[in-house]
Amino acid sequence: YYDNIGYADLSDFFYVWLRRSLRRVVPDLFTTLAVPKTEELVATPYRHGSKDKANAFFLDGMTRAMRRLADQAHPAFPVTVYYAFKQSESQTGEGTASTGWETFLGATIRAGFAISGTWPIRTELGNRILGQGTNTLASSIVLVCRRRPDDAPTATRREFITALRSELPRAIAHLQRSNIAPVDLAQAAIGPGMAVYTRYSEVLDAEGCALTVREALALINETLDEVLSEQEGEFDADT
């Protein structure tokens, strides 16, 4: 959950009472006064000293985890990753992007994976307390990944944008036909957009510098806005 939920911190509430009752029964499980937290893979600024250090910790740990998955993956079968994360998007000079998704996708790509698709799965109840009156996810997004070929080609930024504009409309139409909730569309569109981005070993800008994941996400969101605007232009007055 990146920085959304600190399960180790929450577990301390129960741990102290369990330890009091059970440490003589299962002493090996209750050797510490509180829940161990150093290996928990979350981006908690107070634990690491700053947001940047917390982000670096998450990126490094997630890269190592994903690399182990990539090393064990069989070429005949995809790896599916369940990553239920919702974060308010940030506006920068590069466009709109989400740090949680950016960091997770960066780790996935660094591990040698290419994203081949996404599947939105309705996992959340519409009447749950957390979701009432808020813009929370109605579905969770499953990413489908495969090892990126060692001979994957490079592309220019213009070629990447052209491919996005060519392929994203069909992908969005498919997602909409699957009855995905509108609040989840931007999250789900990351998959087909990143499928284009990760098919290349690198996407280079006009100066020959590699396009970052944040820049790619901003371009995907921009293209998504264009696709949705075109769809609205086709509606009749009643719609």
PLM region spans:
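S-adenosyl-L-methionine-dependent nucleic acid methyltransferase catalytic domains
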Residues: Y1-T239
